[in-house]
Amino acid sequence: MDSLYAIKKSIKNYASGGNVLIVATLLAFIIANSPIADMYFSWWAQPISLQLGDFNLFSHNGHPMTVMEFINDALMAIFFFSIGLEIKREVLVGELTSIKQALLPIVAAIGGMVIPVLLFMYIGRGSDFLRGSAIPMATDIAFSLGVLAMLGKRVPISLKIFLTTLAVVDDIGGILVIAIFYSSHISVTYLFYAAGIFLILWLGGRAGINSKMFYFILGGVVWFLFLNSGIHPTIAGVLVAFCIPAKPVLATTRFISTIRDEIANFPQEQFHGDSDSSIMLSKDQINCLKSIESASDKVISPLQDLEDTLHPVINYLIIPLFAFANAGIVLSGIELSSLFTGISLAVFVGLLFGKFVGIFFSSWLIIKLKIVPMPTHSTWKSLASVSVLGGIGFTVSLFIANLSFGNMGPEGIELLEHAKLGIVMGSLVSGILGYILLNLFLPKQQEVE
């Protein structure tokens, strides 16, 4: 796969999905502070079930999941599944193929994860909200690439690749944090069964099984087992994605040969009257077309096929729904001054300053040491501006905030609301400031790509 084409396609997909995400976030704000706020919040607490006799697929430790838990634990597992597919593609044929090629965004991403966490821990030292230290470490790929897309071809492709790869590495870091720090009460029995099913999936991937249903059904089983094992179920999505075959069943050369043969042998049936007006095909013609259809399916790898299938579902349904459910902040109980204290300040500073300092100065250091070159057609000012966009940590930051405080009772709810305020304000200021700086420092003419 052409990695440059993949980058351009990702930016286009995320940019269009980012618009829907903005609308969903604004709606959540408006409704959470409207007369129907009680109905809005009570809806997410409704139980949800998929019952087969006494068995409920959407149950956790014997209790049915709420709508909110279904979104955060089930639908977001699909989101992390797509992230897993993207990571595997980048490692195999993308910007993470070689360490030398990927070193700049990898080092920048590590700096952009470590510094925000350290700033958060410094501001929150001795407090009861330190369990949320990972909140400002993520970069929202949809929003950040959406801002780049607003500037069109003025942005050098090297900077687009840099930010995209950085966001992917950020996702890897976020996945590791969720797996290590947000898993508890491990059930060895469920984990053992999950490992067995995962082994079957891995062997199926190695054998080149390209049936979506095979991965869908067994992946669902792994998700359920993870849900009840104590390991966060979104990790199941990532692991299942790593099992999806990246090689097509049919090589492109064989595909071309097959298509040419089928077209050359396509039956030319004789009709009475005008054959072009006939709406009925013969059996031989149908069989020939089905052979072409089958060959077309086999030349697309399961990994690429699933990525293309899931992109609209992720960008236009799952992520906007997640934002609509989780971004509702009741402003009546929060003073704006609280942004300058406690967890709101820690998250805000971590996103706006921590991400910039971590990303830019890590990049500056390895470029100055001549370990890697400056991205093509880029300047220090444009690199710094893109580093500011790294502070847009909306989706994954909200997700980690929910994991940190969602089950702590009334105290946790208050901390969660203040964390959300810091996330929204930090992401908003980072996005606006990053756009202004890029608009100021990028060349006014379109970049030749």
Can you say where each PLM-predicted feature lies in the sequence?
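C-terminal ends of transmembrane helices
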Residues: 2-8, 81-97, 145-156, 199-210, ...
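Predominantly late transmembrane helices and immediately cytosolic-facing juxtamembrane segments
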Residues: 2-9, 13, 214-218, 233-376, ...
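Hydrophobic core segments of alpha-helical transmembrane domains in multi-pass membrane transport
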Residues: 21-33, 79-85, 115-117, 197-202, ...
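Transmembrane alpha-helix boundary signature
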Residues: 31-43, 55-66, 82-98, 115-134
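Hydrophobic transmembrane alpha-helices of secondary-active transporters
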Residues: 54-60, 64, 69-93, 313-334, ...
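Structural signature of hydrophobic alpha-helical transmembrane segments
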Residues: 69-80, 128-142, 183-196, 234, ...
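Entry/N-cap segments of selected transmembrane alpha helices
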Residues: 90-118, 187, 191-196, 332-357, ...
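Functional cores that coordinate and move charged inorganic groups
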Residues: 148-260
